[in-house]
From Swiss-Prot:
Alphabetical keyword list: DNA damage, DNA recombination, DNA repair, Metal-binding, Zinc, Zinc-finger
Protein's name according to its UniProt entry: Recombination protein RecR
SMART domains reported in the protein's UniProt record: TOPRIM
Positions of C4-type zinc fingers: 57-72
Organism this protein belongs to: Pseudomonas putida (strain ATCC 47054 / DSM 6125 / CFBP 8728 / NCIMB 11950 / KT2440)
Pfam families the UniProt entry points to: RecR_C, RecR_HhH, RecR_ZnF, Toprim_4
Role according to the record: May play a role in DNA repair. It seems to be involved in an RecBC-independent recombinational process of DNA repair. It may act with RecF and RecO.
Family: Belongs to the RecR family.
Lineage per the UniProt record: Bacteria, Pseudomonadati, Pseudomonadota, Gammaproteobacteria, Pseudomonadales
Amino acid sequence: MSFSPLIRQLIDGLRILPGVGQKTAQRMALQLLERDRSGGLRLAQALTQAMEGVGHCRQCRTLTEQELCPQCADPRRDDTQLCVVEGPTDVYAVEQTGYRGRYFVLKGHLSPLDGLGPEAIGIPQLMARIEEQGTFTEVILATNPTVEGEATAHYIAQLLSEKGLVASRIAHGVPLGGELEMVDGGTLAHAFAGRRPISL
């Protein structure tokens, strides 16, 4: 089916969202135009305001509309721990655990095949932040448990080791409430390698 230029532009715009393919974008566009024009206008206004008003925190690089995000602006946070994550969504996930330290947000993970080296993802800025702050005694590497995430964590751990700093890696393995028979072999191997004694 061929759409008019404005409808085609809307469909193409919606397709940039992760997980939204051609058919889903068409349904969304037609829903907004046919049944929810006021919702479409609210969406357009919210999107415009967010694109113009949201930037990156000058300390941790997460998304915020202020110079400092709420976590960096909070003087009650633990200045001895720094949690390194791959993206802003990871900050929100870690916050739900009750973590009270500081953050540094990389711009993804190392991926030489995609042209993403240390500079592209912000590792020099991470090292500068650690040096400038001077209070971190532990750097928690909370990159994703993928090949690239592991390589990124290993690379950062080596840099930290050269400076005499302690790096720790978040544990991963069998999910809470999960069944062993449903867990893939690689995940189970990580869980066995990371096992720890039961404290009574």
